[in-house]
């Protein structure tokens, strides 16, 4: 069965103009689709247009031209249906310090017009692992719990699409891991996830497909696997018995560096060199190789390659 598009964007353009001579193109004829049930990563450096895109989805920014459909509804013609179809989790943690998670969710559900008989507050608290803290003041929650409470607030009207805008900013590694486990569980229950993050490793691990924006333009849109296959270089690290300087060595397709731990790092182009040949280069320098390890490129390498200009 073919899945429908959760979000469809066609020729989306947003221009912020102070006057005819002073304008900024935040989004330039953007075309993309987010498929139902996927985790979709939206990446880009600061000023790439990510926040503008999310604000257009949420209805807080008016586009200049183009079309945007959310769950089959046009953002201009059906704004109420669009807002009912999407939940936005903002970057900033903004919670009433003296309200409990249960009270905050009940208030949020009321703002969305959800009848009391249709509210699923307890279910949502369990989904984000906050059922034990349901009656605690929100000020007493840890940073990770507050982030999960923001997700819970975005879910009170049971939207099929959840947008996470930098959800792990300022969260430590353990809490970040716990947060992503909750997001994955929501996705398994059928929620379509759109996420922005500056932690590229997270995007690589979490996303089914990734779009990369740069200066308002879409520079890549593909599966995570296909994006990683764009990397043409690989790194090999040698632990040797004494430090040698190879940085002045000029060999086409090889790039040398070293550190004070007697390690030599060589980045090489896969289609030009074999590992055996690189090992022989090190041996010919008269050193003993103690250990060898390799590193494949990651999403950060792709990101830098696509946005460096």
Locate predicted features:
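Conserved ABC ATPase signature
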Residues: 137-141
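A short, flexible loop at the N-terminus of ABC-type nucleotide-binding domains that lies
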Residues: 2-9, 15-29, 79
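Conserved ABC ATPase "signature" region
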Residues: 106, 110-133
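Short, charged/small-residue-rich alpha-helical element at the C-terminal edge
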Residues: 235-309
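ABC transporter nucleotide-binding domain
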Residues: 180-269
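Catalytic Walker B motif of ABC-type/P-loop ATPase nucleotide-binding domains
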Residues: 162-165
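Conserved catalytic motifs of ABC-family nucleotide-binding domains
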Residues: 158
């Amino acid at each position: 069965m073919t899945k429908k598009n959760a979000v469809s964007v066609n020729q989306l353009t947003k221009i912020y103009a102070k006057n005819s001579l002073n304008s900024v193109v935040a989004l330039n004829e953007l075309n993309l689709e987010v498929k139902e049930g996927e985790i979709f990563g939206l990446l880009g450096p600061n000023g790439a247009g990510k926040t503008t895109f999310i604000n257009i989805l949420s209805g807080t920014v008016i586009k200049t031209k183009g079309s945007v459909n959310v769950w089959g509804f046009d953002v201009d013609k059906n704004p109420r249906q669009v807002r009912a179809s999407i939940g936005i989790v903002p970057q900033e943690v903004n919670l009433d310090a003296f309200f409990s998670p249960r009270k905050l969710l009940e208030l949020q559900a009321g703002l969305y017009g959800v009848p009391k008989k249709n509210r699923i507050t307890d279910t949502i608290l369990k989904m984000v692992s906050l059922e034990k803290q349901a009656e605690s003041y929100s000020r007493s929650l840890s940073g990770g719990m507050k982030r999960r409470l923001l997700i819970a607030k975005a879910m009170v009207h049971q939207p099929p699409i959840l947008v996470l805008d930098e959800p792990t900013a300022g969260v430590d590694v353990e809490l970040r891991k716990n947060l992503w486990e909750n997001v994955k569980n929501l996705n398994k229950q059928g929620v379509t996830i759109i996420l922005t993050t500056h932690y590229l490793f997270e995007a690589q691990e979490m996303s089914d497909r990734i779009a990369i924006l740069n200066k308002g333009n879409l520079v890549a849109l593909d599966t995570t696997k296909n994006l990683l296959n764009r990397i043409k270089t690989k790194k090999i690290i040698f632990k040797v018995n004494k430090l040698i300087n190879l940085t002045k060595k000029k060999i086409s397709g090889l790039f040398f560096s070293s550190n004070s731990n007697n390690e030599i790092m060589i980045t090489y182009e896969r289609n030009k060199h074999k590992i055996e040949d690189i090992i022989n280069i090190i041996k010919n320098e008269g050193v003993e190789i103690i250990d060898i390890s390799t590193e494949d490129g990651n999403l950060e390498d792709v990101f830098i390659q696509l946005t460096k200009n």
